[in-house]
């Protein structure tokens, strides 16, 4: 059997973190990146540091065993497409060279121990290239042995620090007995605040518009909140509530919060304590989950052609290319539905709710499911969108896009929008408009679109066509009357005349 040829458009990033080792495999395709593999192993390297920052033999062997697994996957990826970075624990360890030498032998590649500042800048790059924030953004990443705090704007990190506080080191220091009490929580929070307070004034003066968390701690808390039917934004009040709920379990071994995964349980409370300290010291009002972090930042650094591009456009263009979307029809529907949104904006504040980019995305991508088959194409479109990463759109925005794409045609059931929480009303606005736009564009020609007016009063949609237009277009008239009946099933009123 011949050797496998290296896949020139496949890239790998390995992140030797203080809590977990991660491997990200991605493919450059259609002007963007498609994740084709992720491997994560809990190594808890930082737990092997003693008081003199000597890394234990046991911790080293845990790391080497993990890297032996990773090495197999690297064999058919070009060497120049592989980057391996190590962070806080190997920055701190006095015997890091011992670990590094064996790691490089196992992997056959150089291990780059990056500085805290470079780590912070790279984390920001990963967030910037996978999020939709266009203003100033605060990014927090709680790692196993360090926490990165960054303020940036667009694609540039402006203020960045790496702090020597982490969920593994704080677990060893403040929760070593695995007991959960107000006392050890508050001791951990106070210790973290001592470190964070040194940078707090500089960060608060700089200011930010949006705060994002790029760590597993933030993701774990968000999953707990969703399990409790709360919205996805973190606030200090919610963190205090989860702290109180955690203490009720008395020990880490017994900790069983709904939504908390087993692999996060051990370091969850120490990460929570650090996050509370960050919220208190920096006076963070609310925080969402970032779409990327260090690994994604390294990956985008390897592909300069993707730098500083319109992330949402890149994402949408990738779908259009991959699923052979009829671009003329997609643009036709997008143009019409955005005009509809503009006409009703006084009654339905879609723009103020940041709904226009979501409406554009749905209009351009609602037909991707046609590649599978026509009959259920709206469901196929929604399935593809749901199960594909969408850089540039937040998790909650992604859910709205999926719901609206699925709801753009056919029957809708009561309760369809309930899972969207605070975005439910926005999604209903978008669905009502996209359904009308798709019907009006059904002939797939520009010159047959009618002149009409659309108005909203007391949540009643009124479509007014030119004299005799509906009479002269019986199929369109029939489709619109059917749509009126469909919307009525959900308590929506659509008048067509």
From Swiss-Prot:
Pfam families: Ppx-GppA (PF02541), Ppx-GppA_III (PF21447). Pathway: Purine metabolism; ppGpp biosynthesis; ppGpp from GTP: step 2/2. InterPro entries: ATPase_NBD, GppA/Ppx_hydrolase, Guo-5TP_3DP_PyrP, Ppx_GppA_C, Ppx_GppA_N, PyroPPase_GppA_Ppx. It catalyses: guanosine 3'-diphosphate 5'-triphosphate + H2O = guanosine 3',5'-bis(diphosphate) + phosphate + H(+). Signal peptide: none annotated. One of its GO terms (biological process) is nucleobase-containing small molecule interconversion. The keyword Hydrolase applies. The keyword Hydrolase applies. One of its GO terms (molecular function) is guanosine-5'-triphosphate,3'-diphosphate diphosphatase activity. Catalyzes the conversion of pppGpp to ppGpp. Guanosine pentaphosphate (pppGpp) is a cytoplasmic signaling molecule which together with ppGpp controls the 'stringent response', an adaptive process that allows bacteria to respond to amino acid starvation, resulting in the coordinated regulation of numerous cellular activities. This is Guanosine-5'-triphosphate,3'-diphosphate pyrophosphatase.
């Amino acid at each position: 059997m011949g050797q496998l040829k290296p896949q020139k458009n496949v890239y790998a990033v390995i992140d030797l973190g203080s809590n977990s080792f991660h491997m990200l495999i991605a493919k450059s395709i259609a002007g963007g990146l498609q994740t084709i593999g992720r491997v994560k192993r809990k190594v808890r390297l930082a737990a092997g540091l003693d008081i003199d920052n000597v890394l234990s033999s046991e911790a080293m062997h845990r790391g080497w065993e993990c890297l032996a697994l990773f090495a197999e996957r690297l064999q058919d990826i070009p060497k120049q497409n592989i980057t391996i970075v190590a962070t806080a624990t190997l920055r701190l360890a006095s015997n890091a060279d011992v670990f590094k030498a064996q790691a490089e032998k196992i992997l056959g590649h150089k291990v780059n121990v990056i500085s805290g500042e470079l780590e912070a800048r790279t984390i920001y790059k990963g967030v910037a290239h996978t999020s939709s924030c266009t203003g100033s953004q605060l990014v927090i990443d709680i790692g196993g042995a360090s926490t990165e705090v960054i303020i940036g704007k667009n694609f540039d990190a402006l203020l960045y620090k790496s702090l020597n506080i982490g969920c593994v080191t704080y677990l060893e220091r403040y929760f070593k007995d695995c007991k959960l009490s107000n006392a050890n929580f508050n001791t951990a929070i106070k210790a973290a605040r001592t470190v964070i307070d040194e940078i707090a004034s500089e960060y608060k003066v700089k200011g930010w518009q949006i705060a994002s968390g790029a760590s597993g701690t933030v993701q774990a808390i968000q999953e707990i909140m969703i399990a409790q039917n709360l919205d996805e934004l973190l606030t200090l009040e919610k963190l205090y509530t989860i702290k109180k709920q955690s203490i009720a379990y008395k020990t880490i071994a017994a900790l069983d919060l709904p939504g908390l995964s087993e692999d996060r349980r051990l370091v969850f409370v120490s990460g929570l304590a650090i996050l509370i300290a960050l919220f208190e010291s920096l006076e963070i009002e609310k925080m969402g989950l970032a779409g990327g972090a260090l690994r994604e930042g390294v990956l985008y650094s390897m592909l300069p052609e993707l730098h500083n591009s319109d992330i949402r456009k890149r994402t949408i263009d990738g779908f259009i290319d991959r699923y052979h979307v009829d671009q003329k029809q997609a643009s036709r529907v997008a143009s019409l539905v955005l005009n509809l949104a503009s006409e009703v904006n006084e009654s339905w504040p879609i723009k103020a709710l940041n709904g226009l980019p979501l409406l554009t995305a749905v209009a351009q991508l609602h037909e991707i499911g046609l590649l599978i088959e026509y009959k259920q194409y709206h469901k196929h479109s929604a399935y593809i969108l749901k199960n594909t990463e969408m850089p540039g759109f937040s998790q909650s925005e992604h859910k709205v896009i999926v719901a609206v794409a699925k709801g753009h045609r056919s029957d809708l059931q009561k309760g369809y929008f309930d899972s969207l929480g605070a975005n439910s009303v926005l999604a209903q606005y978008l669905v009502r408009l996209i359904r009308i736009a798709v019907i009006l564009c059904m002939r797939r020609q520009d010159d047959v679109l009618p002149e009409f007016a659309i108005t909203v009063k007391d949540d009643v949609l009124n479509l007014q066509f030119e004299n005799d237009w509906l009479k002269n277009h019986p199929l369109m008239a029939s489709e619109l009357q059917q749509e009126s009946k469909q919307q009525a099933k959900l308590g929506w009123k659509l008048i067509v005349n």
